[in-house]
Amino acid sequence: MQTAYPDYRHYTAREYGTRVGLYRLLDALAAADATASFATNGAIADRYPEVIEHLLAKGHEIVAHSSDMNGTIATGIAEEEEKQLIESSLASLERVAGHRPRGWMSIARSQSWDTPRLLVEAGIAYCCDWVNDDLPYSMKTAAGPLINVPVNHELSDRQVIGTQQQSAESYAVQIKDAFHWLVGEAEESGPRFLPIQVTPYIMGLPYRIGAFEELLRWLADQGDCAFHTCGEVASAAR
């Protein structure tokens, strides 16, 4: 259903994430002694700087997530326009965080042919846009190397719950199934990476957060694995 502007129905549903859902996720992460990476728009820094401050105070990582949710990138966009979009996002986040993010996730994983090079030129060390592997890897650009950390959207709550209309409990089962499979591969072929990608306004709802807390507790109790930020994963891949 399309809602006419001003679309408060969708806007406030998502704002629930910054007002309520985020803090439930932070409590769940703290209970599991886990740090995480938060893909964050420049607009969040401009409008809700306290959100950035709370994330950093808890030891979490900020990953630049474009200027706002309309800041998609595609071939055909002028290079200067794309550079400005990247720079505006990084500058807004740096102004509040006190440091420039090392990582980048594009809106809808959108990139142009020039994006990897422009990210390196802007000081980005890794991106999370390419989902074609279970391990991070380095790619070459004309400006130098860029690490890709494959945060697969197939395992996100937006895909499993939002698109496929499954429950939070079903999401947890699928993460556990993926964990068991990857552990089996790791025993034969070396380490594997399992991204857990959740969204505050989706997983932070009161009838879903319990399943997420239980999932984190279960993962924390497993041997031979650990929670890592995307930045830590990227550093290990260098």
Predicted regions and their residues:
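C-terminal domain-boundary segment and adjacent tail
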Residues: 126, 176-238
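Active-site-adjacent pocket scaffolds in enzyme catalytic domains
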Residues: 91-190
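Generic structural signal for well-ordered alpha-helices
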Residues: 22-26, 49-53, 86-90, 116, ...
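Aromatic- and glycine-enriched glycan-recognition loops and surfaces
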Residues: 13-26, 30, 42-49
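Alpha-helix N-cap and loop-to-helix initiation/capping positions
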Residues: 17, 77-84, 166-170, 207, ...
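Active-site gating loops and adjacent loop-to-helix segments of metal-dependent hydrolytic enzymes
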Residues: 1-12
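Metal-dependent polysaccharide deacetylase catalytic core of the NodB/CE4 family, i.e.
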Residues: 4, 32-112, 144, 150-163, ...
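A structural motif corresponding to the C-terminal end of an alpha-helix
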Residues: 25-34, 92-99, 185-189, 219-224
